[in-house]
Amino acid sequence: MTIQWYPGHMAKAKRQVSEKLQFVDIVFELVDGRLPISSRNPMLDQILQGKPRLVLINKADLADPSQTKQWETYFNKQGFAVLAINSQDNKGSKSILPKAKEALVEKLQREQQKGLKPRAIRAMVIGIPNVGKSTLLNRLAGKKKAKTGNSPGVTKGQQWIRYKNDLELLDTPGILWPKFEDQEIGKKLALTGAIKEQLFHQDDIALYGLDFFIQFYPEQLAKRYQLTQEDLQLSTPDLLMLITQKQGFQEDYEKGSQRVIHDIRDGKLGKYTLDRYEEMGE
């Protein structure tokens, strides 16, 4: 599996995020609810240097709710504010500002005690590619998407989007790379669409997805493709061929693989979480 991230790209991305940190009060770290650990940057704590953080578990509508609750607890224990959202339909988005204020309550109180006027909270959205950063920015900005220009005390050229009167977001999200060394993580990222399709063999990813659903969500898999208990006992390659035939693709393994991947990705097999708390959250 070849990934298009090189040391030069990583250094540049890290530098760009680090340079912007000084302008914000808080960082909104966006993760995919289906893989809340695998969709994080491996050097994030080092990059953010203790900056207050709100972890936004995005695409919560596609994730297993019981797993999401456990991951919320996990991030809370790490000392982060956390909120499950779905940036596509605004679910949870209205709670972002109150959560950010909650995370910054001590700082805001100190400013008030010093006699400083109330001001908008400044934030930056960061995350790996395809986790929903731009969608979230557009959702918060609404139709107006008014850039506030160069705010006082901010380096010239930093463009901000105002959300109501209490929040200003850097217009450009911080893009970071996921951890690719682990093949398991690579497959998870591919299955959810975080990696371009041409970068992997589709049948490998389809087989990985089927293996996962057989282990954790067999009833959802059976329901989607009208499978019997006997079908679920087949080897995964044989099961993929059976599904391929059931979908009317005869023996076109590639088309069958594409269908399985996109069905999983689009939530047609139901809600699921690839990063299992019981395996990765301790």
In which residue ranges do the predicted regions lie?
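Canonical P-loop GTPase G-domain recognition
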Residues: 61-126, 145
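Short, structured loop/turn "capping" segments at alpha-beta junctions
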Residues: 107-111, 138, 144-150, 217-221
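Structural beta-sheet core signal
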Residues: 29, 55-57, 125
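Residue-level signal for short, function-critical loop segments
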Residues: 33, 59
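Conserved active-site beta-strand-loop modules that form the wall/rim of enzyme catalytic pockets
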Residues: 87, 137, 167-170
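Helix-rich effector regions associated with P-loop NTPase G domains
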Residues: 1-26, 34-43, 47-53, 66, ...
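Glycine-rich phosphate-binding P-loop
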Residues: 122-142, 172
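Alpha-helical scaffold segments in soluble metabolic enzymes
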Residues: 95, 99, 135, 208, ...
